Each structure stands twice: as structure tokens, then as C-alpha cells.
């Protein structure tokens, strides 16, 4: 299973031309894995400040991936997930969510509610990227 997964990622990254396939796979998959398994990622924990920093890291990683994939052949699953991830982190940034107390509880404050939605969307879409790209564990 792991060999097949590594082959899929290597072929995906080879097709994108983002460098030496094994090195690019290690770097990009490692970054996706780290963000996915972080406290604000799949664990749904972390302080508001941690989660704001986490979204900034997801945003940076997403922009780098999108840039490296421009004009390249990329698997459909991955090419569909990246724009959704860019939208989710963009919503977080647009609402200036790093300035509010973002968490997972419901809020009557409209801005906090939008920030909670953006955080949850970012987690969900990053999970989709993690699984659609078959990032090795």
C-alpha cells in the first residue's frame, strides 16, 4: 500500500514538473502531512492564535503548490481541491479572523461565526487534499 501511495504521489509530482520527484514528494507531502496532523488540523484543537498561525501556514503551502502546478498536468482530484482550499483560507483572511477569538463553538457574533466557518472549511478541504493526494503516513 505504501509503495503504491508513494508511486502515485511521485507520478503526480513528476507530471507537475516541480523538481526531482522523490525530493518534491518528500517536501510537499511532508508539509501537507504536518499541517493535516497539527492541533488545529485534523485534531480540531489548538488555541485561537495557534489556529490563525496554522491557517497562515496552510495558505502559504497552498499558494506554493498552486504556483508549482500552473500549466502542468495534475490529477483531477488535486486540481479541484486546491481552488477550494485557496477560497477557504482566503475567507479566513478576508474576515481578518486572526484578530478574533476563533474556535469551534457557535457564536452570535457574525464575524466570529464566519471565521469559525472558514476555519472548519480549511480543515475539511485540507483533509480532502491529504486523502486525494494519498499522502503517505
What are these regions (language model features)?
Residues 1-7:
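Bacterial N-terminal signal peptides that target proteins for export
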Residues 7-8, 127:
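General helical structural elements
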Residues 8-12, 122:
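Hydrophobic alpha-helical membrane segments, chiefly transmembrane helices and signal peptide h-regions
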Residues 13-17:
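C-terminal motif of bacterial Sec signal peptides marking the signal peptidase cleavage site
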Residues 18-56, 60:
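Immediate post-signal-peptide N-terminus of mature secreted/exported proteins
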Residues 28-46, 91-137:
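C-terminal amphipathic alpha-helix
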Residues 54-118:
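Long, amphipathic, charge-rich alpha-helical segments that form helical bundles/coiled-coils
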Amino acid at each position: 500500500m505504501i509503495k503504491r501511495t508513494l508511486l502515485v504521489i511521485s507520478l503526480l509530482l513528476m507530471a507537475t514538473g516541480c523538481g526531482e520527484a522523490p525530493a518534491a514528494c518528500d517536501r510537499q507531502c511532508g508539509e501537507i502531512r504536518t499541517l493535516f496532523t497539527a492541533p488545529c488540523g485534523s485534531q480540531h484543537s489548538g488555541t485561537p492564535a495557534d489556529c490563525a498561525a496554522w491557517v497562515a501556514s496552510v495558505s502559504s503551502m497552498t499558494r506554493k503548490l498552486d504556483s508549482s502546478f500552473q500549466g502542468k498536468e495534475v490529477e483531477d482530484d488535486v486540481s479541484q481541491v486546491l481552488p477550494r482550499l485557496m477560497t477557504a483560507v482566503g475567507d479566513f483572511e478576508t474576515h481578518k479572523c486572526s484578530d478574533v477569538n476563533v474556535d469551534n463553538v457557535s457564536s452570535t457574533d457574525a464575524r466570529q461565526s464566519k471565521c469559525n466557518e472558514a476555519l472548519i472549511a480549511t480543515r475539511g478541504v485540507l483533509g480532502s487534499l491529504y486523502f486525494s493526494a494519498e499522502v503517505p503516513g
